[in-house]
């Protein structure tokens, strides 16, 4: 049993979390996919239920779904009918393998002090010109939700400065109102960047 409340949440609630109904707009994913070559290789970091991977696969992309929770990976495998790699972000050790990396609502659990290393690993794993997408719950300081899950809650200014300092190019940030599993109104921060 993990002593990390965030990891424990996903272990203990994998089936409920994976089964929840998510009807998210596809505009961001469609824009991400449209910028990639046909049959591009995509790494999904934190695939959860596998919903996004399923959509990308249905569009003809070569997707490698991953999740840090073995229990959520099993749920995604049921949905996808294919293996899902159990991998924590800090285990990413690839060099110029992927055309795109998709991290929807997953890197928001990485401690701020660890984000530079994770962004470096993602940058290294992308091919030259590769595209990165991530989303975060916006804020000004680290904190926890009512389930005890850790969030890094970055601001757009803080996040853009960090990515720029690490060598990312063509960084775009957008914000949108939304929600999350906790049912609370949420300001979401969406990031797109290129290697």
Task: Give the predicted meaning of each segment.
Residues 91-101:
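A short acidic, Gly/Pro-enriched loop at the edge of an enzyme's catalytic core
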Residues 1-37, 39-48:
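Conserved class I S-adenosyl-L-methionine
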């Amino acid at each position: 049993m993990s002593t990390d409340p965030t990891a424990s949440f996903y272990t203990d609630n994998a089936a409920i979390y994976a089964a929840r109904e998510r009807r998210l707009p596809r505009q961001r994913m469609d824009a991400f996919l449209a910028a990639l070559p046909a049959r591009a290789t995509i790494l999904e970091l934190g695939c959860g239920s596998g919903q996004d991977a399923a959509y990308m696969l249905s569009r003809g992309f070569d997707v490698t779904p991953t999740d840090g929770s073995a229990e959520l990976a099993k749920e995604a495998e049921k949905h996808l009918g294919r293996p899902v790699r159990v991998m924590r972000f800090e285990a990413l050790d690839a060099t110029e393998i992927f055309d795109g990396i998709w991290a929807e609502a997953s890197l928001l659990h990485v401690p701020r002090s660890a984000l530079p290393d994770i962004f470096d690993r993602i940058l290294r794993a992308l091919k030259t010109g590769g595209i990165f997408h991530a989303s975060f719950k916006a804020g000004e300081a680290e904190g926890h939700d009512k389930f005890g899950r850790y969030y890094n809650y970055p601001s757009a200014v803080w996040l853009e400065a960090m990515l720029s300092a690490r060598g990312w190019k063509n960084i775009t940030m957008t914000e949108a109102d939304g929600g999350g599993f906790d049912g609370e109104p949420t300001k979401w921060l969406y990031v797109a960047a290129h290697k």
